[in-house]
Swiss-Prot record:
Full protein name: DNA-directed RNA polymerase subunit beta'
Its EC number(s): 2.7.7.6
Positions with biased composition (Polar residues): 1449-1468
Residues that bind Zn(2+) 2: C1002, C1075, C1082, C1085
Amino-acid positions noted as binding Mg(2+) in the UniProt annotation, renumbered to this chain: D626, D628, D630
SMART domains: RPOLA_N
Manner of cofactor binding, per the entry note: Binds 1 Mg(2+) ion per subunit. Binds 2 Zn(2+) ions per subunit.
Gene designation: rpoC
Source species of the chain: Chloroflexus aggregans (strain MD-66 / DSM 9485)
Function: DNA-dependent RNA polymerase catalyzes the transcription of DNA into RNA using the four ribonucleoside triphosphates as substrates.
């Protein structure tokens, strides 16, 4: 195996099938795990010993070979290699898949990597992979042409056939019509004949009948008719009428008429018959025509349909291209249309074939580049995304088809163990179930393929295999998650990595450790600052191995076994051994939650009886510990290096200052403060008041004799002078003969006692010492003793003797820390002693209710009654009434607090506790003795009924009920806040974890202006803000011009005072925000390390410190948004923790303020519907003057409009003056002025609840706030640029913390802000090979551009991007860091495709792979290694130069040695290295980063 520390970068990429097989020790073919009778692994199963190694050390499966002497032998019977059982943690197996399957990470991620590469939508890709659609994987172009021709021929034949059929039908119709018409002619003639015959017959009948009647009449002529004689219905002769010739004439007439009627009928019938025939003929002709037309239409339809079908089929053939997705129906049709032309398939096999055979990455990259150049909008965006993936594959050497698995790796069995439980049942890792499903399905698929099963069954089995592999890799990512017994979701390989319980966060970034224990803590008031009390039995367990060894060394036990027995029986000698052992070891104490680095500190252990750990009271603040049941963990650092680190860096006495703000964190509190306050109080009129003493000893004697009280004001003569202010009279005396100052001072014995415990340089403090005073003492002590000015050589030598020969600054820090620790311990002892002697207790009688309270309440009640009366009369609204009532009661509460304060006895224990800062404040005392005042309901709205009682008087039921709201909300808030603050800290740590001080100076000229104008209620004074910074430019005295300090000078307390005294209101300092270091920060830009008060050392992990400093006070911040009077208004802006998250996540803030988009003048517009608008008008006037000399005359009118290029004046010789810009021309006696007005307007709609900050006519700048609220940092970046946003982020974060009384130094927020603004987004890539829209580190961007410019190419352009801390963490260069933060699978997917290399520059990535972190003491090794690499590289470069010179100039060369003599060529190598070593060791303090990265070779 490779040596664990023998690499400095780690690469992740896709594994090829060959890689997977090369890792494997054999194929797993059976789903069995172990045999339940023999409890031995099954052969070829998931726990097979042949593949994964033996289950017992040095013993094969069958037992033929046992013992270590057969090491490396492979048993000929069972095939198991004789080796250690632990190989089962590292040996892998594999499964040969019967059908390729896709890797779900590359399919289901967003965006789908496979989909982007193949340009297939994720939905379609899924349909193909899960056997719902076909995808075309191959098209034969030559056969495609043949198929086209065949289709065309087929349709041509079909067209011909149809047309032929139509022609035949047409002829048939025509013949039919002719026949029909002929038949009609015949019928017509027959009808005419019939009519003629009928006519003749009827005529003959008529004539015959007439003849017969005539004959009869002629016979009867001259006679009278004996009856009516009728002819055809007409009476010719009536009865009794005479028959004569007239009668015959009449008959002839009738016959004539009848004949006419017959003739008429004949003509009519003939005409009708003809008409009927014509009509019938026309009908037949019409029907024939219709039929012809129908036939024509049908023909046309059929032809059109054929054309359409042909077109569709040809189109289908034309569309036939590799990668086309088709449904099953379409596949069948196409197969019929073009058999053998194409091949379509389903599943991962089809996709693999596409990737392997048809994806030309180089060609695709060129096409996408061209598309990016020519397209816009969504198309360009998509092309960029695709190009990014294509380029990733091209550069990384990964093959796209490796995203499809043909071989599945099987992880070692000991990483997915199977253990027997008590009841004989087995518990197994979920992975075994998931692997078993894969193997079962794979084996079934193999059998089905062998049996030539129907396609549909095989396809279904392939789909099930795909789903089984999906579940193994990432269960639940697609479809329903596979669940085991009891419905629980099986944990897949991805789940093993993801989340808090995943491999990264559970086992790599956080581990359980041996040599640790935990117990309850109790106070250890007699301990020194660097000590802790460790229970004996706990210590014995922790140091057991060491004690055993010591017992053997001392001869108490003969061997380790005896020693172990002795320890277990706790023989008396064991305790002596333990005492000896423990002297050499420090232990680490840790209290969870570890919110900052002071939550783990090192202590010397003192053995104590009992079972609780004793903790020094002064370190409680750092641990945030109290003694109400808190527990702490103890750890033993084992190695010599770890012990050394604990002793030099982690010992509690070296951690006196808070890294967040540089003030002491070892500050006396509570009892100690109370004791010191009691001691330094002056009680006028106490016993002995006014007495005078010649010396301190005399006064102490009087006190011990009981003549004076400890708090009595007395006069004492003493040597020395007052330190700071004095609250009692002081009279200076002439100095003593040796020059010692002397004075007579009014003080108390208590103050003398306190001062006697102070280090001499800190005396004499003659004032009331409260908590703040004690803090000052500690700070002054540290400052005094760490300043080299105040230390003698003897003191430094004393430290040297104890701590070795270190840098003088480091020695001063150690000495100062030790002196301060001693001082703190002395104050602690004194405070506890006098808190006890003073006997300050608190009882119910100490709380007196002031008589004024009742008057205040009565008056308030009257005012409220008056307001109610006005409301009932309708003079004020409900809202105004509510606001006024709340105001009255708030005022009453204020007055009550004042009355309570006034009423307090300053010497009473309650007042002393409050005013000294030991415990409690005036508000709490007021709740006990005054009135509780107004409460708010669960929404945060103030309830207008106050609680008029106090705790001394007792609350009524209603009062108590109203109080519960606030109490419950407080508890809920605290619980929520803790989790939120923890998560915020985690994100901050993640974004800043690689910010380490790496170099001395980055050489930047940039910096940050600090202005005194920014001083305010919430911001600290300029003098405080500039402390510990490094000047970015020289600073001079304003009046004399004398240099006060040069660039790169650290601003200490003295220099800060000088700068302020010189009247400077702004200082230009270096800042992490402007640091140009490529990785991490440089010392100069960071400045002072607040935890030591000295310039930061190389290797300090300032990013982590910044994150902890911001995150640790997070729990103190309020959670909710504030509601003013319960009514949501524009004031309802987020505060507290949510606001901090809003700032660091760069989110659009709630209640966002409107910002001016351009410089200009404001106009406020109010419209009818209550809509308000702000219009900003920007008018810029440009003028251009043209002198009229030598007889030039204008050719334009004054105040006329002219355009650019127009002639405005001409000279006597025809010379012309041309207008250079368009605008209005004004003619004066000797010149023409053209004035151009540039007019721009922006209109913004004001939200209805926003308060406008500007007035009509105000001038505003771009980026200025127009309404109340918080600005959106993204808009600010756009409008005002990077600097403005940096300033905004720092100031806004500080506002939140300062408003809660939390002090954090600006530079911590600057470190985080720098990380948020580290990236730039590429706009135009130039010749850099970057992609538009790509995010890249700004240092990398600068380096790339410099390289390109030096080669004469076009540089890229980019815009700064503001990322929230979560986004910034995920965009880090280290994939290990990003993957262990969030979205593990997405980060690893991208990193694998890109073949990313992690150079292990941050802390997390080194912790993950188990290397020393590149910070603190861990950076030394790294620097040594870089040093060696640099020397080797430079030596190589020099050799190359010499080789080139040699080949150009064939003379022997010699190099100058360090002393100037010539060295023969043979010694060159050794000489070169020695010279380079010398140069580099001399050049450690580089002024410029570039020097260290690119050494000047000319000097060699």
């Amino acid at each position: 195996m490779l040596e664990i520390n023998d690499f400095n970068a780690i690469r992740i990429s896709l594994a090829s099938p060959e890689d997977i097989r090369s890792w494997s020790h054999g194929e797993v073919t059976k789903p069995e795990t172990i045999n339940y009778r023999t409890l031995k692994p099954e052969r070829d199963g998931l726990f097979c010993e042949r593949i994964f190694g033996p289950t017992k050390d040095w013993e094969c499966f069958c037992g033929k070979y046992k013992r270590v002497r057969y090491k490396g032998v492979v048993c000929d019977k069972c095939g198991v290699e004789v080796t250690r059982a632990k190989v089962r943690r590292e040996r892998m197996g594999h499964i040969n898949l019967a059908s390729p399957v896709s890797h779900i990470w590359f399919v289901k991620g967003t965006p789908s990597r496979l989909g982007l590469l193949l340009d297939i939508s994720p939905r379609n890709l899924e349909r193909v992979l899960y056997f719902a659609s076909y995808i075309i994987v191959d098209v034969k172009e030559d056969m495609l042409q043949v198929a086209r021709e065949m289709v065309q021929e087929e349709y041509a034949a079909r067209r011909e056939k149809i047309q032929k059929q139509a022609e035949e039908k047409r002829i048939e119709l025509s013949t039919q019509l002719t026949q029909d018409l002929g038949g009609m002619e015949t019928a017509q003639r027959s009808t005419q004949r019939q009519i003629e015959e009928d006519y003749r017959r009827q005529r003959d009948e008529l004539v015959g009948e007439a003849e017969r009647l005539r004959e009869r009449l002629e016979e009867m002529s001259g006679t009278l008719a004996d009856e009516d004689i009728i002819f055809r219905g007409v009476t010719v002769v009536e009865e009794g009428e005479l028959i004569n010739d007239n009668t015959l004439d009449q008959l002839d007439e009738l016959v004539e008429q009848e004949l006419e009627v017959l003739e008429e009928r004949r003509r009519r019938d003939l005409a009708d018959a003809e008409l009927l025939t014509d009509a019938e003929r026309e009908r037949k002709a019409y029907e024939a025509t219709q039929e012809q037309e129908r036939l024509q239409e049908r023909l046309q339809r059929e032809l059109d349909m054929l054309v359409r079908e042909e077109k569709e089929k040809l189109e289908q053939l034309d569309k036939l291209k590799v990668g086309l997705i088709i449904t099953e129906n379409e596949y069948r049709q196409l197969r019929d249309v073009a058999p053998g032309v194409f091949r379509a398939d389903m599943g991962a096999g089809a996709i693999r074939e596409l990737l392997e055979r048809h994806l030309n990455l180089d060609k695709l990259a060129e096409e996408l580049q061209a598309e990016i150049q020519t397209s816009q909008g969504q198309r360009r965006k998509k092309a960029t995304k695709r190009l990014r993936i294509v380029e990733a594959f091209r550069k990384s050497g990964n093959r796209p088809e490796w995203m499809i698995l043909t071989v599945l790796p099987v992880i070692p069995p000991d990483l997915r163990p199977m253990v027997q439980l008590d009841g004989g049942r087995f518990a197994t890792s979920d992975l075994n179930d998931l692997y078993r499903r894969v193997i079962n399905r794979n084996n079934r698929l193999k059998r089905l393929i062998e049996l030539n099963a129907p396609e549909i069954i095989v396809r279904n089995e392939k789909r099930m295999l795909q789903e089984a592999v999906d579940a193994l890799i990432d269960n639940g990512r697609r479809g329903r998650a596979v669940s085991g017994k009891g419905k629980h979701r099986l944990k897949s390989l991805s789940d093993m990595l993801k989340g808090k319980q995943g491999r990264f966060r559970q086992n790599l970034l956080g581990k359980r450790v041996d040599y640790s224990g935990r117990s309850v803590i109790v106070v250890g008031p007699n301990l020194q600052l660097h000590q802790c009390g460790l229970p004996k039995k706990m210590a014995l367990e922790l140091f057991k191995p060491f004690v055993m060894r010591r017992l053997v060394e001392r001869g108490v036990a003969h061997n380790i076994k005896n020693a172990k027995r002795a320890v277990e029986r706790v023989r008396p000698e064991v305790w002596d051994a333990l005492e000896e052992v423990i002297k050499d070891y420090l232990v680490l104490l840790n209290r969870a939650p570890s919110l900052h680095r002071l939550s783990i500190q090192a202590f010397e252990a003192k053995l104590i009886e009992g079972s609780a750990i004793q903790l020094h009271p002064l370190v409680c603040a750092a641990f945030n510990a109290d003694f109400d049941g808190d527990q702490m963990a103890v750890h033993v650092p084992l190695s010599r290096k770890a012990q050394e680190e604990a002793r030099t860096r982690m010992l509690s006495k070296y951690n006196l200052l808070s890294p967040a703000h540089g003030e002491p964190i070892i500050t006396p509190s509570q009892d100690i403060v109370l004791g010191c306050y009691y001691l330094t109080m002056v009680r006028d009129g106490a016993k002995g008041t006014g007495k005078r003493f010649a010396s301190i000893d005399e006064a102490m004697l009087a006190y011990e004799k009981g003549l004076i009280d400890i708090q009595a004001p007395i006069w004492i003569r003493m040597n020395g002078s007052i330190s700071g202010k004095s609250d009692r009279p002081v009279r200076e005396l002439p100095p003593a003969s040796d020059g010692t100052p002397r004075m007579v001072i009014e003080t108390t014995i208590g103050r003398v006692l306190l001062n006697s415990e102070l280090q001499p340089p800190l005396r004499f403090r003659n004032r009331l010492i409260d908590k703040k005073g004690l803090k000052e003492i500690i700070a002054d002590c540290y400052q005094y003793y760490t300043s080299l000015r105040n230390l003698s050589e003897a003191q430094l030598n004393e430290v040297r003797a104890a701590h070795g020969n270190k840098h003088v600054q480091e020695l001063a820090r150690i000495y100062g820390s030790e002196m301060t620790a001693q001082q703190a311990d002395r104050i602690k002892t004194l405070g506890f002693r006098y808190a006890t002697l003073g006997g300050m207790t608190i009882g119910i009688d100490d709380i007196e209710v002031p008589a004024k309270k009742y008057d205040i309440v009565r008056e308030a009640e009257q005012q409220v009654a008056e307001v109610e009366k006005q409301f009932r009369r309708g003079l004020i609204t409900e809202e105004e009434r509510y606001q006024e009532v709340v105001r009255i009661w708030q005022e009453a509460t204020k007055q009550t607090i004042a009355a309570v304060k006034e009423n307090l006895n300053p010497f009473g224990p309650v007042a002393m506790m409050s005013t000294s800062g030991a415990r409690g404040n005036i508000n709490q005392i007021s709740q006990m003795a005054g009135m509780r005042g107004l409460m708010s309901d669960p929404t945060g709205r103030i309830i207008e009924l106050p609680i008029k009682a106090n705790f001394r008087e007792g609350l009524s039921v209603l009062d108590y009920f109203v109080s519960t709201h606030g109490g419950r909300k407080g508890l809920a808030d605290t619980a929520l806040r803790t989790a939120d603050a923890g998560y915020l800290t985690r994100r901050l740590v993640d974004v800043a974890q690689d910010v380490i001080i790496n170099i001395e100076d980055c050489g930047t000229e940039e910096g940050l202006w600090l202005h005194s104008a920014d001083d305010g209620e919430l911001m600290e004074k300029l003098q405080v803000r500039m402390l510990g910074r490094i000047l970015a430019a020289p600073i001079y005295d304003k009046t004399t011009g004398e240099l006060i300090a040069d660039r790169n000078t650290e601003i200490d307390e003295e220099l800060a005072e000088k700068i302020i005294a010189a009247g400077h209101e702004s200082v230009f300092v270096r800042s992490p925000l402007t640091c140009q270091a490529e990785h991490g920060l440089c010392r100069m830009c960071y400045g002072r390390n607040l935890a030591t008060g000295k310039l930061v050392e190389i290797g300090e992990a300032v990013g982590i410190i910044a994150a902890q400093s911001i995150g640790e006070p997070g729990t103190q911040l309020t959670l909710r948004t504030f509601h003013t009077g319960g009514v949501a208004s524009a004031d309802d802006i987020t505060q507290g923790l949510p606001r901090v998250q809003e700032i660091f996540e760069a989110r659009v803030p709630k209640g966002k303020a409107l910002l001016a988009e351009i410089d200009g003048v404001v106009q406020i517009i109010r419209e009818d519907e209550g809509v308000r608008k702000i219009r900003i008008v920007s008018t810029n006037v440009y003028t251009d003057e043209y002198p009229l000399t030598r007889g030039f005359t204008p050719v334009i009118e004054s105040e006329s409009d002219v355009y650019e290029g127009q002639v405005i004046a001409e000279g006597p010789g025809g010379e012309q003056i041309i207008a250079r810009l368009s605008g209005k021309a004004f003619i004066q006696s000797d010149r023409i002025i053209i004035s151009q007005e540039d007019h721009e307007e922006r209109e913004l709609v004001v939200p209805h609840n926003a308060r406008i900050r500007v007035e009509n006519g105000d001038r505003v700048m771009a980026g200025q706030q127009l309404t109340d609220g918080s600005a959106n940092p993204q808009e600010l970046l756009e409008l005002q640029g990077r600097e403005a946003v940096q300033r905004y982020l720092v100031n806004e974060a500080q506002k939140v913390y300062r408003s809660q009384g939390v002090n954090i130094n600006d530079k911590h927020i600057e470190v985080i802000a720098r990380q948020m603004l580290r990236r730039v987004r590429i706009e135009e890539p130039g010749d850099t090979g970057l992609l538009p829209g790509e995010l890249i580190d700004s240092a990398e961007f600068r380096r790339l551009n410099n390289d390109i410019v030096s080669q004469g190419g076009d540089p890229a352009t980019a815009a700064t991007v503001l990322l929230g801390i979560t986004k910034a963490s995920l965009n880090t260069d280290s994939f290990l860091s990003a993957a262990s933060f969030q979205e593990t699978t997405r980060v690893l997917t991208d990193a694998a495709i890109q073949g990313k290399v992690d150079y292990l520059r941050g802390l997390k990535e080194n912790v993950v792979i188990g290397k020393l972190i590149p910070a603190g003491t861990g950076i030394e090794k790294r620097l040594e290694r870089q040093h060696e690499d640099l020397i080797s590289e430079m030596a190589r470069m020099l050799e190359e130069v010499q080789q080139a010179e040699k080949s150009a100039e064939p003379t022997t060369t010699a190099l100058p040695t360090t002393n100037g003599h010539q060295a023969p060529q043979s010694d060159t190598d050794a000489l070169l290295r020695a010279r380079l070593e010398e140069l580099l060791s001399g050049g450690n303090d580089h002024d410029d980063e570039e020097d260290s990265d690119h050494p000047d070779l000319s000097s060699l």
